[in-house]
A protein has these predicted regions:
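N-terminal juxtamembrane cytosolic/stromal segments of multi-pass membrane proteins
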Residues: 1-28, 56-59
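Interfacial transmembrane-helix boundary/kink motif in multi-pass membrane proteins
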Residues: 18-34, 68-79, 101-123, 222
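Alpha-helical transmembrane segments of multi-pass membrane proteins
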Residues: 34-55, 128-133
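Perimembrane loop-to-helix junctions flanking transmembrane segments
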Residues: 53-73, 174-179
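Alpha-helical transmembrane segments of polytopic membrane proteins
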Residues: 74-87, 256-263
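Transmembrane alpha-helical segments in integral membrane proteins
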Residues: 84-103, 200-217
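Juxtamembrane helix-loop-helix connectors linking adjacent transmembrane helices
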Residues: 98-194, 211-220
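Transmembrane helix-loop-helix hairpins at the membrane interface
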Residues: 184-304
Length: 304
């Protein structure tokens, strides 16, 4: 029993001790593997926005939620800006300590992890192309300009929402862009941020809280608790791209569409299953790599 407890990997599954799958499911791997993503997001956000600390920038919604929570708990606005990355690291350190797993990590595993994340992003790319055929483009899946604006032809929906006129799933524009044109760098930066902070909120935190509620409060079976937690977290993940709660107010970020909602829900289920099997590092990495691939595909082939 002790061995099983100490080497229980991912969120709900076991792998052979010290195998690649077991090692890369450890929280310490998530810290080291995702640290460059976090740094790139923080630095990139500053570079692509003016007046960073005065709220005139594009940010990932989940990042904003963490900021506001920290401000509510007594942190200043400047501290709230730098604190969310520390929250990610602290949570993962806590999980690493609680898991009782080895702290050792092998740098040789990081390239295979990046390749794995890229390959795991492919099914979502294929699904998005299937649902948004270029023959009959459905336009933006994540955001709209004003009601009179024409939807552009972008085929591959990204997992973030950054400006008023492009495909995305998870970040929202707060303020105005520095330029009217779309920034490829900005979309890559926000995609990386969405991969980390949305997976933190909707998978690592929300699924665990839902599991506790269904198992410990409602006394449901583990199987039923897991199914309900995955479905609810996926639905909320999808819904928050249509209606978000920011700065004490609800706001609509995109008109509701069943195809859009369905794709995001499927993506949420996919990420939840991936989280249950492979842990936070691979899930967040897959989310981020999907956003990057989708951004590049849209920019290279589908925008005009």
């Amino acid at each position: 029993m002790e061995g099983k407890r100490r080497y229980d990997t991912g969120q709900f599954f076991n792998f052979a001790r010290n195998s690649y799958l077991e090692r890369t499911s450890r929280p310490v791997y998530a810290i080291v593997f995702l640290l460059p993503f976090i740094i790139f997001y923080e630095v990139g956000t500053i570079l692509i926005n003016t007046d960073v600390l005065n709220q005139s920038q594009v940010r990932v919604v989940a990042f904003v939620w963490l900021q506001h929570l920290l401000e509510y708990l007594g942190g200043g606005s400047r501290l709230a800006w730098v604190a969310p990355p520390l929250v990610v690291v602290i949570i993962l350190i806590g999980l690493q300590v609680a898991s009782g797993k080895q702290w050792h990590f092998s740098p040789e595993d990081f390239l295979p992890m990046a390749i794995e994340c890229t390959l795991l992003a492919v099914p979502l790319i294929v699904l998005s192309l299937f649902l948004n055929s270029p023959a009959e483009p459905q336009g933006d899946i994540g955001r709209f300009a004003d009601s009179a604006a024409r939807i552009r032809n972008e085929v591959v929906p990204r997992c973030f929402l950054v400006e008023a006129n492009s495909l995305s799933l998870a970040a929202v524009e707060l303020g105005h862009r520095m330029a009217a044109g779309k920034s490829l760098l900005a979309d890559i930066v926000t995609g990386l941020g969405a991969g980390i902070y949305e997976e933190l909120v909707f998978r690592l935190i929300l699924i665990c809280l839902l599991m506790l509620f269904f198992q410990d409060v409602l006394r449901l079976t583990r199987r039923n608790s897991l199914i309900l937690s995955v479905l609810i977290s996926a639905a909320l993940f999808s819904a928050h791209h249509h209606v978000v709660f920011v700065e004490g107010h609800f706001g609509r970020t995109a008109a509701f569409n069943w195809t859009e909602f369905g794709f995001r829900t499927i993506a949420g289920v996919y990420f939840a299953i991936l989280f249950a099997i492979r842990g936070f590092a691979i899930t967040a990495g897959t989310h981020a790599f999907y956003d990057i691939i989708a951004t590049i595909l849209n920019a290279a082939f589908f925008q005009y």
